[in-house]
Swiss-Prot record:
GO function terms (MF aspect): mRNA binding; RNA binding; structural constituent of ribosome
Keyword flag Ribonucleoprotein: yes
Stretch forming the transit peptide: 1-29
Organism annotation: Arabidopsis thaliana
Ranges of residues in domain RRM: 31-109
Family to which this protein belongs: Belongs to the universal ribosomal protein uS19 family.
Disulfide bond positions: none
InterPro entries found in the cross-reference section: Nucleotide-bd_a/b_plait_sf, RBD_domain_sf, Ribosomal_uS19, Ribosomal_uS19_bac-type, Ribosomal_uS19_CS, Ribosomal_uS19_SF, RRM2_NsCP33-like, RRM_dom
Quaternary organization: Component of the mitochondrial ribosome small subunit.
Gene3D superfamilies: 3.30.70.330, 30s Ribosomal Protein S19, Chain A
Name the UniProt record assigns to this protein: Small ribosomal subunit protein uS19m
Protein task: The RNA-binding domain found in RPS19 may functionally replace the missing mitochondrial RPS13.
UniProt gene name: RPS19
Length: 212
């Protein structure tokens, strides 16, 4: 009898641990918000200020490209309570921030992200060192090599005229289909937020008069 009781206790403990862990993760995720559509000029300080009117903001993070250091156009805001997070979603989703309309939703993948700046830097260094060990023999300038790979990937993709240019495309050369042909275009910071079609001009062919 004592053996059965002890065994039952272990079984109950084994079941409760995963369930409580899962519930904790769901609660953790519901207080973290994903902020999309950020302008290139929005940093972590201005992002936190934008949500400071909602009580309980503990952290604001803007995700950046580790090669260029530029914003990827999205970030995360952490709240103490679910009520504050829900209020922020209702009030801020679709609103304008630094000239860009932002989207605000519950962060689905937040638990997989680093929990602190130190962890984020450590993880980035590990990935960078691993990538350098594979790439340094191909090109001694690793940053230039990574940028070349990024540009090559973007060049292979043909962008629609209706697509919006995001901050992560800056310094990349892309191909845009203008309805007749594919136009190469260099993306600069001034083009962020515009449609690809604004820069996919159709070349007019001049017809020469036939000699009589």
């Amino acid at each position: 009898m004592a053996f059965c009781t002890k065994l039952g206790g272990h079984w109950k403990q084994g079941v409760n641990v995963p369930v409580s862990s899962m519930l904790g993760s769901l609660r953790y995720m519901s207080t973290k918000l994903y902020i999309g559509g950020l302008s290139p000029g929005t940093d972590e300080h201005s992002l936190k200020d934008a949500f400071s009117s909602f009580n309980g903001v503990t952290e604001a993070r803007v995700m950046t490209n580790k090669v260029t250091g530029r914003s990827r156009g999205y970030g995360f805001v952490n709240f103490i309570s679910e009520d504050s997070a829900n209020s922020a979603i209702s009030a801020m989703n679709g609103q304008e921030l630094n000239g860009f309309n932002i989207s605000v939703n519950v962060a689905k993948d937040w638990p997989s992200l680093p929990l602190s700046l130190d962890e984020s830097i450590e993880e980035a260094e590990k990935k960078e060192n691993k990538m350098m060990s594979r790439s340094v023999w191909k090109d001694p300038f690793v940053d230039a090599f990574l940028m070349k790979k990024k540009n090559a990937a973007l060049n292979r993709k043909i962008w629609s005229r209706r697509s919006t240019i995001l901050p992560e495309y800056v310094d990349s050369a892309v191909r845009i289909y203008n309805g007749k042909t594919h136009v190469r275009c260099k993306i600069t910071e001034g083009k962020v937020g515009h449609k690809f079609g604004e820069f996919a001009f159709t070349r007019k062919v001049k017809k020469h008069a036939k000699a009589k």
